[in-house]
Amino acid sequence: MNAFNKLVKHSKKISNFNHLSSIVGWDQAAVMPSGGAEARSQAMAELSVHIHGLMTQPQLADWFAEAESETLNIEQQATLREMKRQWQQATVLPEALVEAQSLAGSKCEHAWRSQRKNNDWAGFEKNWAEVVKLSQEEAQIRAEATGKTPYDAMLELYEPGATTEQLNRVFSDVKTWLPSLIDVVIEKQSSESFIAPKGHYPAESQKALGLDVMKLLQFDFNHGRLDESVHPFCGGVPSDVRITTRYNESEFVQSLMGIVHETGHARYEQGLPKHLAGTPAGEARSMGIHESQSLFFEMQVGRSPAFIAHLAELAGKHFSAMNDPVFRVENIQKLYTRVQKDFIRVDADELTYPAHVILRFEIERDLMNGKIKHTDVPELWDQKMQAYLGLSTKGNDQNGCMQDIHWTEHKSIMSTAKHDYKNGCLQDIHWCDGSFGYFPSYTLGAMYAAQFMASIRKTIDVDDVIRSGNLTPIFTWLSKNIWSKGSLLTTDELVKAATGEVLNPEHFKNHLKSRYLG
């Protein structure tokens, strides 16, 4: 067996353990009782250490050296490149740091779920301080190994090839036109009337509706399922994709579009090249490309008038309210394209969402580069919310910096005024697991999605296809140009091969103006 095949075999062994980790992660978020948290954290930490050990075995260096001198075809060369990239990322971290991060992240994430509800920044901060410290250690180690800045080194984990310089340029441009566009659209919509859902929409009916929409989007139920969790996500593995949503029985709009979004993630996973399964080349290209697929489904397809006609019909059927004006197509369209400034990222509309992302990008960039301290975050959050959306989280961090979970697991300016942490810096799950460098993927994904749709429209009558209820031509394009490519190409190569150009944010800007200004 040559060195390349030894590496592929070893990669598939690692993939099997990652498979277990992913399914157990879904279980922890969706069905595990709270009493299982401590033991689960220990088990997950042990598994993380074992996987890290497999990825850093000493013989791998020799195998990579040998494989690089072997005669390989283009696909094998790309597979070798991706295996080596992941190996290099793993070997720079000491095992003790990997274990410490897993333990700190699990502890922080579990506590965050109750701390956010209670607006408990003080309690959260005690756990998060350790996550931030360990993530900064990781960022510094990666920076020294790659010659990048600490934040760029973390970006590489989610967006290979992306740099702070590129993101600063793209997001700085967005900040020149987005705030004024938001204000213009809000003013335009102020004279429009709509009917908000009122009444009782049972979770069982919402789930049945969601399953029907997943069928319309051609989700493969032989290789996936829908469940419920506090924070909607797509997990599992390509052969067993797990997506979740959350239900609010006083309305159905959020959970339904959340299912459309997560189905986009799932279809990408289910469409990855099966002959490369178990190797990095058979995985998603980047988180930005992953988000492009969920946002393509949600924003480009899901909020189009043609698709909303299907949603209106299905919703009316499942809630036995075909004559209810709430379910008229034009009303559902207004509900899904309504623009308003809000504290919560996951509830934000398409137009204001980039402002939430840019705020988080700027904070995590400066946090990883050591320009700010973790105790500065609530005050900075409030300043940026006021600058970008005209909202203040003083007296409010639950809908601010405590809303996302990503910063708590991976990886001092305190105002005397009481903050609403729940609606501010406590709202996201991302920072709970130390996923510093992830947030830009959301807006990059929206930009890629708009660019893909612009390209598809050159050869396909998208609106007619969606109206027909058979979306196969659209999915065939995505499969041919995105899904089946896995990580064989770099992000720039993938986007250029699919659309004829690398990322061009103008497509996103044009899409927003067309949809919201007509």
Give residue spans per PLM region.
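Divalent metal-coordination and catalytic microenvironments
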Residues: L7, A143, H261, S294, ...
